[in-house]
Amino acid sequence: MEKNQKINNAAYDQLNKDADRILQLIKVQMDNLTLPQCPLYEEVLDTQMFGLQKEVDFAVQLGLVDREVGKDLMLRLEKELSKLHDAFTNV
């Protein structure tokens, strides 16, 4: 049972790292490259979020992450991205 918990924790940690990586990528993009209204920005964000959602779905299907935990992770990232977007557009 302990081995399963380690695997579950590792899966969740990796999903969190991927979510943080997306947030950092978007921060860099907003700071250096494009505006939030730019189609390139939207394309990168949509692609990254889609990929992370598929990772979460896969982890849930394997029983590595609880469905609610996966939803919470996605909601947390969406809220952080929304705050970042608001901060950038309200400057």
UniProtKB/Swiss-Prot annotation:
Transmembrane segments: none annotated. InterPro entries: UPF0358, UPF0358_sf. It comes from the Bacteria. Belongs to the UPF0358 family. This is UPF0358 protein SSP1677.
